[in-house]
Regions:
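Structural preference for solvent-exposed beta-strand-turn elements
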Residues: 1-370
Length: 370
């Protein structure tokens, strides 16, 4: 029999366990994917989870020997960790492979976890049952301020597509100093000179949603042909990259706007939220914007609300209330008071911008509205 004894700080282990479990599926036909791979290697303990598309790995200091196993009941252990202060001691005994070809059961082992007067003893799965961590052959490497990138993603994620036929549109596009999202009805993007990429690529939203695990620390973004990784040394997120092309953002945004106005964001949002209460069929009941007045016609009645604007549009344009609200809230998240609204014709996209963030909302064709 092979034995190993390892020690970690209980609080650090709980924190790392909570981070990596964000990736593990709660239900899966492959049992190992619902659990955490734990690997001790002398002075480090590394925890890994995956759903085969996305990987999350966290390392913490450790003492002791070397061993690896797949936990049983990882989420229950996470809950139990709050009752285990101080040091956690892991004692692992792996089954000795027989002379004949070993079976899965032969390679499984026994694990004891002790802390003070508390002890857990359970059968655990052999590390060989867990998928191997993929390599990221980086062609480009960038330094990322995760706190800033997280905020930028939160502002634009509303425009991500759910169309699986176009996987790139389900992802965040990184191009020059910008990131963007588009779903066919809306477009959202923002820029930051601190992160400028050499060639466009697309990061799935699952990886972007994991940025909080870095707790604001800077990391390296490694981009290859098939995979990308956010890596701070202690935390690593690996994701597959989608194949195909996405929208050319610059080609989609009109360059000439004969009409431009400054709108008060909270005033516009409040008036839209008021009118939205009377909408029963969003796909057939647009907001009409004419002369600074928001108009809504429904089967139950007509409703209007006037915006606080010094200069009002000279042409009528229609839009879906929820789409415009999403665009305005992109700027509201930055705690801005006003934003520039730019329009071309009643059938051209409506642009909201502060020169750093941009939101595009497609118009509603009013000749079909009634």
């Amino acid at each position: 029999m092979m034995d190993a004894r390892c020690i970690v700080n209980a609080g650090e282990f709980q924190k790392a366990l909570e981070k990596v479990l964000k990736v593990a599926p709660k239900k899966c036909s492959i049992p190992a994917l619902m659990e955490v791979l734990v690997r001790f290697d002398g002075d480090a303990c590394t925890l890994t989870c995956t759903d085969l598309e996305l990987w999350c790995q966290a390392s913490i200091p450790a003492e002791g020997g070397s061993c690896a196993f797949v936990l049983a009941g990882s989420r229950r252990l996470l809950t139990a960790c709050k009752f285990l202060p101080g040091e956690l001691e892991f004692s692992y005994r792996k089954g000795q492979p027989p002379e004949h070809a070993p079976t899965k059961t032969d390679l499984d082992g026994d694990l004891w976890i002790s802390c003070g007067g508390k002890e857990i003893c359970q059968r655990v799965t052999a590390a060989e049952e867990f998928p191997e961590l993929p390599d990221v052959e980086a062609e480009h490497t960038y330094t990322v301020q995760t706190a800033s990138l997280r905020k930028r993603f939160e502002r634009i994620k509303y425009a991500l597509s759910d169309d699986s036929i176009r996987p790139c549109n389900q992802c965040v596009k990184f191009f020059d100093n910008r990131i963007g999202a588009v779903d066919g009805h809306r477009l959202a993007m923002n820029r930051d000179e601190a992160l400028c990429v050499d060639a466009p690529f697309h990061i799935p939203p699952g990886a972007m949603r994991l940025l909080p695990v870095f707790e604001g620390a800077d990391c390296q973004l490694l981009v290859g042909k098939r995979r990308a990784a956010f890596d701070s040394g202690d935390i690593r997120i690996i994701t597959k990259l989608p194949e195909g092309e996405s929208l050319d953002f610059d080609a989609a945004i009109p360059r000439h706007y004969p009409e431009g106005y400054t709108v008060n964001i909270s005033d516009f949002v409040g008036n839209l939220q008021y009118l939205e209460k009377f909408i029963s069929n969003p796909s057939r009941e647009p907001i009409r914007f004419n002369g600074g007045v928001l108009l809504l016609h429904t089967k139950s009645g007509d409703y209007r609300s006037r915006l606080d604007m010094e200069d009002a549009p000279r042409q009528e344009i229609g839009f879906r209330a929820s789409y415009m609200l999403d665009g305005l809230q992109q700027f509201q998240a930055k705690k801005l008071d006003t934003v520039s609204m730019q329009m071309n014709t009643p059938v051209s996209p409506i642009i909201l911008t502060d020169q750093v963030d941009t939101a595009l909302v497609l118009p509603f064709y009013l000749n079909r509205a009634a």
